[in-house]
A protein has these predicted regions:
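Extracellular LysM carbohydrate-binding repeats and other cell-envelope/extracellular binding modules
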Residues: 23, 27-28, 35-39, 74-117
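N-terminal signal peptide c-region/cleavage motif recognized by signal peptidases
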Residues: 11-14
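Primarily a LysM-type cell-wall glycan-binding module
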Residues: 26-76
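Extracytoplasmic
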Residues: 41-44, 77, 94-98, 126-129, ...
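A structural motif detector for short, solvent-exposed N-terminal "entry" segments of globular domains
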Residues: 114-160
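Solvent-exposed coil/turn segments that connect beta secondary-structure elements
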Residues: 87, 104-106, 137-139, 146-148, ...
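Exported/periplasmic cell-wall-interacting domains
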Residues: 19-22, 178-299
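Cleavable N-terminal signal peptides
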Residues: 5-6, 16
Length: 299
């Protein structure tokens, strides 16, 4: 009986201990949303999942009702934003849980750029056509055009034992699909929209079906959700070579899009919010004053 009880406890504990990953369909809809971008970021607050009955279903219903300003369906739709902010998806919330969300329900409907941990303007990159930043501390990435933020999203870098190298890179060769060489025998790890930044070590930005929300677990590459990887593939440029743009063979004649990798791998959940004088505040990613002065990371 004791053995059976132990097995039951393990079976129920395993899902709770498992690493969560982003719902890529939900994020794809959010990241591609065209909506107003206010001059200042929204204020945030701690939202509580609670109901006098203690019932989690009723507590979630109350949360939806509050977020939707009385419209439960709208509130459920708005709560999808929790995933972009790295919070627990609404359907998994239980009584007693808390999550950080915009303080005003109307601020759930803004442009995804409004929720970015990155500055809207990067003066140091104002003369650079396109620049990409990967921040390991927050496990996010961002794209800038002439110093203006145009896209951002979640990312998952290398684990502490196989870290993504920091420094300045440029995009090299690229491939629409590629199988990872890190896959165990008999397994097939397919990557799409592969954009290499370190040829010698095989470090890429790429799409992957599993992008963890917690500590990074990769082998050095930068995992991205499908919508972001596809966007970045179309927006960025690989190197120019005598064999063609972004080709694996040939002699390089011009570098591709600039990529800066910075920060430190988090031990636990990535840093997303900090305590401010009036409540939680979005963490602010600091960017280098001169990205071209950042030491190269591929040497």
């Amino acid at each position: 009986m004791r053995t059976l009880l132990l097995l039951v406890l393990v079976a129920f504990a395993a899902p709770a201990l498992a690493q969560r990953s982003y719902d890529q369909d939900v994020l794809g809809a959010l990241l591609g949303r065209e909506a107003p971008l206010p001059a200042a970021p929204p204020a945030y607050a701690v939202w509580h999942v609670e109901h006098e009955s203690g019932n989690s279903i009723l507590a979630r219903h109350a949360l939806y009702e509050r977020a939707g300003e009385g419209d439960v369906a709208l509130g459920r739709e708005r709560l999808a934003l929790a995933q972009l902010l790295g919070e627990t998806e609404a359907g998994l919330l239980r009584t007693g849980d808390t999550l950080v969300l915009p303080a005003r329900p109307a601020d759930f409907d803004l442009s995804p750029l409004a929720y970015a941990p990155y500055p809207r303007e990067w003066p140091g990159a104002a003369e650079i056509d396109k620049a990409v930043v990967v921040d390991k501390t927050t496990q996010t990435w961002a794209g800038y055009e002439r110093g203006r933020l145009v896209r951002w999203g979640p990312a998952s870098t290398g684990a502490a034992e196989t870290p993504t190298p920091s420094g300045r890179f440029t995009m090299n060769w690229r491939a629409l699909e590629r199988e990872s060489s890190e896959a165990p025998p008999g397994e097939r790890w397919l990557m799409r929209y592969v954009m290499n930044i370190h040829a010698a070590r095989g470090i890429h930005l790429h799409q992957y079906d599993v992008v963890p929300t917690g500590p990074p677990q990769g082998h050095g590459c930068i995992r991205m959700v499908t919508s972001d990887a596809e966007w970045l593939w179309g927006w960025s440029d690989g190197w120019q070579t005598t064999a063609g743009p972004g080709a694996l063979g040939g002699r390089p004649t011009a570098p591709g899009t600039l990529v800066i990798v910075q920060g430190e791998e988090p031990d636990g959940a990535p840093l997303r919010f900090v305590d401010g004088p009036n409540g939680p505040e979005r963490v602010a990613v600091m960017l280098p004053p001169d990205p071209l002065a950042v030491p190269r990371g591929d040497r």
